[in-house]
Amino acid sequence: MNLLETVEQDTMPTHYKQMTQAEMIARVTEIKAQLGENLFIPCHHYQKDEVVPFADAIGDSLQLAQIAAQNKKAKHIVFCGVHFMAETADMLTTSEQIVTLPDMRAGCSMADMADIHQLTNAWPKLQTLFGDTILPVTYINSTAAIKSFVGEHGGTTVTSSNATKIVSWALEQKERIFFLPDQHLGRNTAFELGIPLEHMAIWNPIKNELEYEGNLDDCKVILWKGYCSVHQHFTVKNIENIRKNNPKMRIIVHPECTHEVVSLADDSGSTKKIVTEINNAAPGTEWAVGTEANLVGRIIQENPDKKIVSLNPFMCPCMTMNRIDLPHLLWTLEAIQNGEQRNQIKVDKQTTKFALKALERMLQLS
């Protein structure tokens, strides 16, 4: 889903924005009770605090994919996340289940950095350079079309929770991997597995060319030149400031951060790992967290016995995740209550066929 194509697609009536918080909470609570098991609301960790209390499940991308695959009861799945997550939920659920996204503008800039036409142009060039020695691996933060291509070519999806296991498996299948769309997760994972940086190349989808100065025979990992616009804003300078001003503070970051940041942090991991590690830490411990602002704020609220700050004090929330708010959730639920279909996410059968192969490989390995 291209964000530029959907920037003016918000058709929610204005009266929802004029309701009080209390009115909206009461209505959402009422509709949830009426729909019962026919409604399921999965919610990503990066969602707004006003939405999270209504979630039936909260988690990272892997957890939500697993939950979607297991849920067979709910007719309506209202996904509080972004577009690629709702696509994944649609593909993993039955044809009778309906997946909706409260605001169609909730996309992902990283996912949009890997266009299927760019990938189909890249693949034959890479085959010419390396022959049949490459396994494609896509971060779950990608479009259904990208997942489908990867699945059709024997590859798999991956999340930040299972990246080490999945990439290790992938490198056992072929001599090298093509990791997309997030170069940083790919680089950090491969480095953790012992692959030196000089054996990693960059694929530039704009120029449609490989960026690599070494011997091609040494290249083990090809990284698509994409990134997370949120995690790019955590810098080495942020870490230096914490070390200087708060030397006791433990720094934990998401692996979508740059390699330089991850290398200097005390630890890195998925949103699930970050939440679990801080929740289980001893009272009085101090933390600087390098991930999305909504989640950091929630961790602070849930751990009043610890000192927790954002690694970057000027960090903003993920703006597309932030599209999902209480008015849009209520608007969506009222449509379901009235028998109307709105903002359904539906992936076509051909795309689903091969994307499921990539997703199922990941879930089996996880």
Swiss-Prot record:
The UniProt record lists the keyword Transferase: yes
Q: Where does the protein end up? A: Cytoplasm
One cellular component term from this protein's GO annotations in UniProt:
cytosol
Q: Name one GO biological process term.
A: 'de novo' NAD biosynthetic process from L-aspartate
Q: Give the reactions, separated by semicolons, that this protein catalyses.
A: iminosuccinate + dihydroxyacetone phosphate = quinolinate + phosphate + 2 H2O + H(+)
Which GO terms fall under molecular function for this chain's record? 4 iron, 4 sulfur cluster binding; metal ion binding; quinolinate synthetase A activity
Q: What is this protein called?
A: Quinolinate synthase
Question: Source taxonomy lineage?
Answer: Bacteria, Bacillati, Bacillota, Bacilli, Bacillales
From the UniProt record, report the name of the gene that encodes this protein. Answer: nadA
